[in-house]
Amino acid sequence: LSKPSLFISNHRDIVLDPALVNYALFDIGAKTVEIAVGDNLLTKEWISDLMRINKSFIVKRSEKTKRAMLTASKNLSAYIHHALTDKQQPIWIAQKEGRAKDGIDKTNSALISMLLLNKPKPMAIKDYLDELNIVPVSIAYQYDPCDQDKAKELATIETEGKYEKSEHEDINSITKGLMGYKGKIH
């Protein structure tokens, strides 16, 4: 890789997905990525510690007002651009909020909109996106240790219209995903 890249990845496992990208980069002698992590995951101290050790930065997903969300999105956009262009630091970010539970891997257009918030007005969109050096990433696991939990969540949404996570459900999913059997990975 001639310059730092923004790796936009499908999302199955917040720990292992970027770790696999880092392994591939390390294997070729390239810098490893900084990892975008949602603030919803930082409910336990050991998770916060794990994220800090792994060069993570926070994506504020829990802002309460539209103005606060816009400010957080602008700051995130500016940071990603700064990391790539000034720090020469590659970045990993999921293509959409949360893990894919339905197997549909489609980049959320809001992600691209967020990335463009930092674009100077006179600059062409294509030129700005070229600066970000976006690299799509797709990772597949033969087995998903969280598949029953994901199916239960989708079924609840289908029958009740919504799903309420328990307090540390995301953390339990991280642990199960990290420790569970995944079979072949590609």
Mark where each language-model region is.
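Soluble catalytic domains of membrane acyltransferases
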Residues: 1-185
